[in-house]
């Protein structure tokens, strides 16, 4: 695999980073979750994702919400979903970044998400046998997620 660089250059003494590579989750769901939790305090973002996993909090789909139905509750947008699989994977990346910050000696109660983004990963190419000796592609898209945390005062 090639080396992936972070999109944002930061001071390594003041920030903690983590990256999830080749995650088998939906890129559209990941984009919507990253947009929603960007800039949040870390504890608040972890609680938000836990509520999404428990089907108590809706993630508004602002970019990829053309045919997405309304959900009950106040969340500030008309279209929304509960992307549980993507929330679980992003939650594990956030907790990894939190542990990296703790290892660096940063105060984990005063961390906020400075940068979070999702990029297209590689495609796992497979095929499905069909009738008369043919085969149809059955590809699996993957996603890379980057998180940078910083202390706020």
From Swiss-Prot:
Q: Does the keyword Ribonucleoprotein apply?
A: yes
Return the SUPFAM superfamilies for the record: Ribosomal protein L22
Quote the CDD domains the UniProt record gives. Ribosomal_L22
- Could you tell me which Pfam families the record lists for this protein? Ribosomal_L22
* One GO process term, biological-process aspect: cytoplasmic translation
Q: Which InterPro entries match?
A: Ribosomal_uL22, Ribosomal_uL22_CS, Ribosomal_uL22_euk/arc, Ribosomal_uL22_sf
The alphabetical list of record keywords is: Ribonucleoprotein, Ribosomal protein, RNA-binding, rRNA-binding
TM ranges are: none
The UniProt entry's GO CC annotations, sorted and at most eight, read: cytosolic large ribosomal subunit
Q: Which GO terms describe its molecular function?
A: rRNA binding; structural constituent of ribosome
State the coiled-coil residue ranges.
none
As for what it does, the entry says:
This protein binds specifically to 23S rRNA. It makes multiple contacts with different domains of the 23S rRNA in the assembled 50S subunit and ribosome. The globular domain of the protein is located near the polypeptide exit tunnel on the outside of the subunit, while an extended beta-hairpin is found that lines the wall of the exit tunnel in the center of the 70S ribosome.
**Subunit relationships:** Part of the 50S ribosomal subunit.
NCBIfam families the record matches: PRK04223.1, uL22_arch_euk
Q: Which family does it belong to?
A: Belongs to the universal ribosomal protein uL22 family.
Q: What is this protein called?
A: Large ribosomal subunit protein uL22
Task: Give the organism the record lists.
Answer: Methanococcus aeolicus (strain ATCC BAA-1280 / DSM 17508 / OCM 812 / Nankai-3)
């Amino acid at each position: 695999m090639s080396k992936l660089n972070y999109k944002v250059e930061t001071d390594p003494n003041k920030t903690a980073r983590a990256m999830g590579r080749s995650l088998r989750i939906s890129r559209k769901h990941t984009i919507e979750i990253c947009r929603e939790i960007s800039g949040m305090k870390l504890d608040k973002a972890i609680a938000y994702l836990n509520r999404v996993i428990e089907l108590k909090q809706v993630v508004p789909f602002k970019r990829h919400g053309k045919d997405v139905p309304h959900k009950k509750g106040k969340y500030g947008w008309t279209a929304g979903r509960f992307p549980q699989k993507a929330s679980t994977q992003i939650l594990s990346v956030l907790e990894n970044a939190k542990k990296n910050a703790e290892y660096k000696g940063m105060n984990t109660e005063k961390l906020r998400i400075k940068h979070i983004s999702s990029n297209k990963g590689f495609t796992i190419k497979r095929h499905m046998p069909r009738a008369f000796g043919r085969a149809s592609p059955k590809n699996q898209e993957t996603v890379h997620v980057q998180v940078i945390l910083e202390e706020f005062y």
